[in-house]
A protein has these predicted regions:
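Intrinsically disordered, tyrosine-centered linear signaling motifs in cytosolic regions
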Residues: 77-78, 216
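Conserved N-terminal alpha-helix of the aminotransferase class I/II PLP-enzyme fold
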Residues: 78-111
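Extreme N-terminal starter segment of soluble prokaryotic enzymes
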Residues: 16-19
Length: 397
């Protein structure tokens, strides 16, 4: 019988002479959960997905129409390596409207999703002696990107007493002459928490490059998201269209960077990626110009789901110390039920047929927690939580 708790090393044996940094990378566990869930579905099992951070909405109609029109207009060739100038102007205008900051369109690199932006920044900033400060827990892939750039991840615990927020003093203590950058993410994955103005001002003053992942901006239900560019122009901003506009499959993101870095970033972009999809870029222009009402509609639906899920999880015995303010995740304390979030997540999948993400996927600081995604219909969320509740009852909780 297949052991779903295996490390998957047998499946992923590599050649003898491979990069040791790659061997240090951990699996993206949520993808392992999804892979097993898909296997169960192929066997006829009805699985409810509360694990994957992907909007369940279709792209806005204006986005689909723009993509189709781009094909009809034969806009299927390479664009400028930094991205279509019209799209970069729209991104700059968006940052002016949203945050009151002036962004030079020539300081924007359009990428195939925001993940290439992470790679571009780290390849620019890092060498084998570099250190990059990350939160623990934090987005699972940051650490592996740092390893891919031959650098060392330095993990700073989030403070449970402070609502799973970054502690600026803990960061300050980790800054050394080798620090190449500090990753911040707001709203945060997996916690959904916003970084406040005081923190952003403080971290911007440390004299270290800040890499600010702002991909969940636009999906904020309480408070206001601030861009790091409101406090410094020496930062690197990662953003994109996947979450806000539900455009995950179109793979469109962007990087905003200091002007002094642009030529180096352009060389990296030219050599590694050439350019982002011309079709997706046309769709991005339409999204920024016309999709605000679609985003507002999606946000209202997410918020309804968020409120329901928070209430229901608490009834079930999960502890939610601080309610998430944005994104579409709830990071719930499951230590009443388990000390092994990996095993717990797969047990829930196998027995309740609901996919959830183990907290250990986000670092050792996430152990004992599980992440629930409310990027699914309210009907599916209700059914999924019913199944988990029944499973926990069978286990004696």
């Amino acid at each position: 019988e297949k052991n779903y708790l295996c490390s998957l090393t047998d499946k992923r044996k590599t050649m003898k002479h491979t990069n040791p940094q790659v061997e240090q990378m951990t699996s993206f566990i949520v993808m392992d959960v999804l892979e097993r869930a898909n296997e169960l579905q192929k066997q006829g099992v009805d699985v409810i997905h509360l694990e994957v951070g992907e909007p369940d909405f279709d792209v806005p109609a204006c986005v689909a129409e723009a993509a189709k029109a781009a094909y009809d207009r034969h806009l299927t060739h390479y664009t400028h390596s930094l991205g279509d100038p019209e799209l970069r102007r729209e991104i700059a205008a968006f940052y002016q409207r949203e945050y009151g900051v002036t962004v030079d369109p020539d300081c924007i690199v359009v990428t195939s999703g925001s993940s290439p932006s992470i790679l571009l920044v780290l390849m620019l900033l890092c060498n084998s002696d570099s250190e990059v400060i990350l939160s623990n827990p934090g987005y699972a892939c940051y650490r592996n990107f740092v390893l891919a750039a031959q650098a060392k991840p330095v993990l700073v615990p989030l403070s449970e007493e402070n609502g799973l927020q970054y502690d600026i003093e803990a960061i300050r203590k980790c800054v050394t002459p080798h620090t190449a950058g500090i990753f911040i993410n707001s709203p945060m994955n997996p916690t959904g928490m916003l970084l406040d103005e005081s923190f952003l001002k403080s971290v911007a003053s440390l004299g270290v490059p800040i890499i600010s992942d702002e991909i969940y901006h636009g999906l904020v239900y309480e408070g206001r998201a601030h861009s790091i560019l409101e406090y410094t122009d020496k930062a690197f901003v990662l953003n994109g269209f996947s979450k806000r506009f539900a455009m995950t499959g179109l793979r469109l993101g962007y990087l905003i960077a200091p002007k002094s870095c642009m030529r180096s970033l352009q060389k990296l972009q030219q050599n590694l990626f050439i350019c982002a999809s011309s079709i997706a870029q046309q769709a991005g222009i339409a999204a920024l110009r016309q999709a605000d009402s679609d985003v507002e509609r999606m946000k209202q639906i997410y918020d309804e789901r968020r409120r329901y899920m928070i209430s229901r999880l608490r009834e079930m015995g999960f502890e939610i110390k601080v309610e998430p303010q944005g994104a579409f995740y709830i990071f719930a304390d499951a230590r009443k039920f388990t000390t092994d979030s990996y095993r717990f997540a797969f047990d829930v999948l196998e027995n309740a047929h609901v996919g959830i993400t183990p907290g250990i996927d986000f670092g050792t600081g996430g152990e004992g927690y599980v992440r629930f995604s409310y990027a699914n219909s309210l009907e599916s969320i209700r059914e999924g939580l019913d199944r988990i509740s029944q499973y926990l009852s069978r286990c004696g909780f």
